[in-house]
Amino acid sequence: MTSSRSTELIETQEDVVRKLSQKTPVSNFSALPLPNGPQAPTQLQPFQFEFPLPAGQEGSVTLPLATFPKMATFLSRHRRAQLTQLHAVVSPSAVSIGHPLTVQLIWVPASSTTTSSQILGTYGGQQISVGGQVTNSSPAKVSANLLMMNPHIKDSTSYTDTPKLLVYSTPAVPDDKLTTSSASIIVFGEVLLSSPQLNPSA
């Protein structure tokens, strides 16, 4: 009687060992792919802001997008931001009819040494005239080539090759008394935001 129970017990233990040996071993060398973990949430957001050009006078504007105050405020609730598209538009005002203006502009990396006097001699630079008797019915748009510069304008580290806008404007006839600009620059695009944070940061 005792021998029979011992045999049953031994067989039961052998069955357990056999079943365990048939299971896929769990190890770092398993051929099975690891399951994908949860992805960080992202949010695609449009943005737009405007700044006027100097009124009645020759002038230049340098706009490094990553450190521009309006952009920094827009991104303050997220730790990471990546541009998906970026454009600049020269938008004339009613004043431009009597005060024409020529505008040169270009998108370059922030570390670029290109100056306002070199815009038209640099790849991508454009010149746009607004105002006078003939005015474009639609704003002229200059797009940034994000393949030639770093689209990550906010990250755990800072980069020196994020987009920078250079603008040089020249009135047809300078006017010291003019207080309203003949045109404004409108910067707009879309940015992919991730890693939201509770406390705003620049």
From Swiss-Prot:
Gene3D superfamilies: 2.60.120.20
Any GO molecular function: structural molecule activity
Keyword match Glycoprotein: no
Cellular component, GO, one term: T=3 icosahedral viral capsid
Localization per Swiss-Prot or TrEMBL: Virion
Keywords from the named record: Capsid protein, T=3 icosahedral capsid protein, Virion
SUPFAM superfamilies, sorted: Positive stranded ssRNA viruses
Pfam families the record matches: Tymo_coat
Keyword Cell membrane: no
Function summary: Self-assembles to form a T=3 icosahedral capsid composed of 180 copies of the capsid protein. The capsid encapsulates the single-stranded RNA genome.
Family: Belongs to the tymoviruses capsid protein family.
Protein known as: Capsid protein
Source organism of the structure: Erysimum latent virus (ELV)
